[in-house]
Amino acid sequence: MIKTLTILTALLLAPLATLHAADAPTPPAKPNILWIIMDDVGAELPCYGEKKIETPNMDRLVREGTRFDRAFLTASVCSPSRSALITGMYQTTIGAHHHRSGRGTEKIHLPAGVEPVPALFQRAGYYTCNGGYPAKGRGLGKTDYNFEWDAKIYDGNDWAGRKPGQPFFAQIQLWGGKNRNDDGRWYRDEAPKALGTLTQPEDVTLPPYYPRDPVLLADWAQYLDCIRLCDKQVGEILQRLETAGILDQTIIILMGDNGISHARGKQFLYDEGIRTPFIVRGPGVARGTVRNDLIEHIDMAATSLAWAGLPVPSRMQGRDVFAKDYQRRDAVFAARDRCDVTVDRIRCVRTERFKYIRNFHHLRPLLQPSGYKDAKPTVIRLRELHAQGKLSPLQEELLFSPTRPAEELYDVQADPFEIRNLAGDPQFRSTLETLRTRLDRWMAETRDPGPESEKAYDASYAYELKTAKSPERRNPMMKNYELMKQWAKEGK
């Protein structure tokens, strides 16, 4: 009887297995590969739980592909993140971890055996391109790599320039959250034309560490509308591929380069800064699937090479997340270092349940003076509310404490906003010690070089000062540079 039931069960399940296989057709030998990268966009998408907006085109990608729910960036600001992404390497391993480093007199060169991924595709016969949206003239889309590289790794800025039948490896850079610019011009003049109705600030839900203040509510509403614009652009890209008859020959990956630009988001290692959307659609990709395994954005490099049938360099730290022998990660790692002239060093390790953060400059406040962040309307308003004593005790503690904990530990399942630091709780001492050791091991194994040399820092400062044309940018930068030097002397 048991044998009969087993056979019957197998017969009943066989059609389902066949259907699943049909939903994920074998990719062509050399599929087109398209990375769509949204600037300053985190995981605040409807398919990840956001309730206030609709994104039908991104939802289509999810229905027709695979959504990764635990995808994380190894860096929380654009240039280290993009340097890591394009090489499949931790930015710390390749020395590209300081924001906009290598631009001055102190150049950064990739280690032996490490190349930008487009060069590997190009040698394999792919047409490589990187464009903004829409691509304009001959200019490339955003690169922002912190190392020396040859622009010839890109054949152009749009796959329209390829030979007939030539496969392409393309990147499309969406302006994303940067459309929420400081003077509000885009939102005032262009957003209504592009989107029609706009998200109402009073409808927005903020994380508990931000006050429900009109400035912050309006800013978050604009951010959600930036995501809606990205969705519209994704729809236009899909339509273009469909019209050309190549949608089903193209593997698409949608992700962000860092989280929302906000006080506790971009530049920091809380999930608001490093959790990224990661959606994949195309031949060989299971449809309507959700994966909960931990992945890092550097995995996109190895995975893309494998799709094209190209060997993954032995030194590459990213993994092919669709490989039959794929070893799931039990933890992911991230690093934050100098941003503009503001010196910092933070490292973290995150498992499915816990996140451990180490603040090397814990004697400094979270919101150090920063020319970039201090110009944001949200941070300006937060500083005003802090000065007026109008923030809650929680908001004061998390945003404006004069120092930071040397170590932070969060149960991200029970505390997704990372509010309750468990590092001093005896109940979690074993977890703290385990993750502390795990982070130490990762830093050693990946050869984390740590702080920037004073010579390199000064060279980066000189470059930043030269490119800052207005007194509004130069004066705070010079003031912050002197403060960083003073704090360094004081051992902060």
Q: Which residue ranges define each predicted feature?
A:
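Formylglycine-dependent sulfatase
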Residues: 2-13, 19-408, 416-437, 451, ...
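Beta-rich accessory regions
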Residues: 436, 441-444
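Short, charged, surface-exposed hinge/linker loops at domain edges
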Residues: 451-465
